[in-house]
Regions:
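Conserved N-terminal beta-strand and adjoining loop/helix that marks the start
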Residues: 1-22, 41, 75
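Acidic pyrophosphate-coordinating catalytic loop
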Residues: 2-6, 30-33, 76-87
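Active-site-adjacent beta-strand/loop module that shapes the phosphate/pyrophosphate-binding cleft
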Residues: 16, 76-98, 108, 130-131
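Conserved Nudix-box catalytic region and its N-terminal flanking loop in Nudix hydrolases
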Residues: 20-61
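A short coil-to-beta-strand element that immediately follows conserved catalytic motifs
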Residues: 66-75
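NUDIX/MutT-family hydrolases
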Residues: 99-131
Length: 135
């Protein structure tokens, strides 16, 4: 018998007008997955929560960003090594310097070229490679 799948989650690819992607540096806490690693913002669905609502909530809770559901565009939902992940993208229309984090150490914009050289947490490198090349 195989193990039960992990919890479902969401992640959001936030893209600025120059085509750069906002990544979040995770806390440097050894008790969390991928400590001190750059990742896409996101989190786990709460019981009964729709994925798009989770994406809105996570961006508000972790970064103080108010992104309406209509501004989120579904990219893919796929089983990953840790559970079912729903990926969305949205245009980023704020200066990252104004983002006040409640989780993580920092946020920063990265070009597609920079992202291609990075080791990201979870399986975010694969997700971004597919997204940035239109796959």
């Amino acid at each position: 018998m195989s193990a039960a799948p992990g919890p479902a989650g969401v992640q959001v690819i936030l893209v600025d007008p120059a085509g750069r992607v906002l990544l979040q540096l995770r806390d440097d806490d050894p008790a969390i997955p991928y400590p001190g690693t750059w990742c896409l913002p996101g989190g786990h669905l709460e019981d009964g929560e729709l994925p798009v609502d989770c994406a809105v909530r996570e961006l508000r809770e972790e970064m103080g960003l108010d992104v309406p559901p209509a501004a989120l565009h579904h990219v893919v939902s796929r089983q990953r090594s840790y559970g079912l992940e729903h990926t969305w993208w949205a245009a980023l229309d704020v200066d990252p310097a104004t983002i006040v984090l409640t989780e993580g150490q920092a946020v920063r914009l990265f070009s597609p070229e920079e992202i291609g050289t990075m080791t990201l947490g979870y399986e975010d490198g694969d997700v971004l490679a597919d997204f940035l090349t239109g796959r």
